[in-house]
Amino acid sequence: MTVIAAEAIGVAHERAEDYAGLSIEELDQRIATAKAKLGERLVILGHHYQRDDVVKHADLSGDSYGLSVDARKTAAEYIVFCGVHFMAESADILGRDDQTVILPDHTAGCSMADMADIEQLEEVWDELDEILGDAEAQVMPITYVNSSAAVKAFVGEHGGACCTSSNAEPIVRWAKNLRPKMLFLPDQHLGRYTAFAKLGIPLDKMLVWNPNLRYGGHTPEAIREAEVLLWAGHCSVHAQFRPAYIKAWREKHPEINVIVHPECTLGVTNEADYVGSTAYIIKTINEAPAGSMWAVGTEINLVNRLQTNNPDKTIVSVSPFACLCSTMYRIDPEELCWVLENLVEGNVVNQIAVPTAIKQKARLALERMLEIAGN
């Protein structure tokens, strides 16, 4: 379990009272002042799904893969991560011992990461041992970075690696070449899309593993025949997109380009013209010709920012409803200002500190990912 400084939880109530009444102009000025005082001792990392009034203060912005690389390379003493819990954990795992990682809101979690806990994973591995004789020799565990530090540690200890939506293809290919089977968790949709669309593994060689059922809900024979075991997890945002939404856009605008994130269901990715990570989505649309129209299947803050940054194009969400990552949205300018001004005063609040034993094993999985992906 990740350790959060106990005093940060109590101080949070004071933060709400002290900062809630400030205008956005006051907050912007105070954040800028705090950043100037901290100088090179500080780096603020901002995920693409953060709201505009937070991400504008980031020194570096990116997707989970890019920010993992940034966290590994930065020389700053303080890493303030405007993202969600598992991202801050990864920054702490990859960072130096003398670096401090801070998450402005310690309740900013990830429902997908919560769908795979370490106790369930250990039970699943025991079942695979029972069925296959030696899970270690037969199954390569691969975890999406959207997972807890404890899950990453388990994967690292058992020879596996992490992946992101940017590098899932080379990681899954690596796993396939080393062991006859792989266990991909916690996002079944990214695993299925990568294995099927990128590596050509037949869908009938994949099983969705329900960790709440014995043997994942399958017979031992079916498990022995399978090549890819997909953990029954998903992203609550990307699961909201539907193939019917894409068809509706095409009926209204036959010229529309559809680009979606691989966390969407296979039905959605099959209907799209382009599929890729947030970094891929941004690059593709930024480089698209003026006058083009795009329907984007990812979190609404990024979709809106793409339209703002590309006024010569028409950019809409695939969904008729706002698909918002509510946990990303928990981080606001008030909390960012609070943690920065505390740092100026020499106080560290909301530190994310992964226990050493977990950190060492989890680093194996993250370092393997970076090595395989070329960073």
Curated annotation (Swiss-Prot):
SUPFAM superfamilies: NadA-like. Pathway: Cofactor biosynthesis; NAD(+) biosynthesis; quinolinate from iminoaspartate: step 1/1. GO terms for molecular function: 4 iron, 4 sulfur cluster binding; metal ion binding; quinolinate synthetase A activity. It comes from the Bacteria. Gene3D superfamilies: NadA-like. Its cofactor is [4Fe-4S] cluster. Iminosuccinate binds at H47, S64, Y144, V145, N146, S165, H261, P262, E263, T278. GO terms for cellular component: cytosol. [4Fe-4S] cluster binds at C110, C235, C325. Binds 1 [4Fe-4S] cluster per subunit. Coiled coil: none annotated. Its main location: cytoplasm. One of its GO terms (biological process) is 'de novo' NAD biosynthetic process from L-aspartate. It catalyses: iminosuccinate + dihydroxyacetone phosphate = quinolinate + phosphate + 2 H2O + H(+). Keywords: 4Fe-4S, Cytoplasm, Iron, Iron-sulfur, Metal-binding, Pyridine nucleotide biosynthesis, Transferase. Disulfide bonds: none annotated. Belongs to the quinolinate synthase family. Type 3 subfamily. This is Quinolinate synthase. It comes from Herpetosiphon aurantiacus (strain ATCC 23779 / DSM 785 / 114-95).
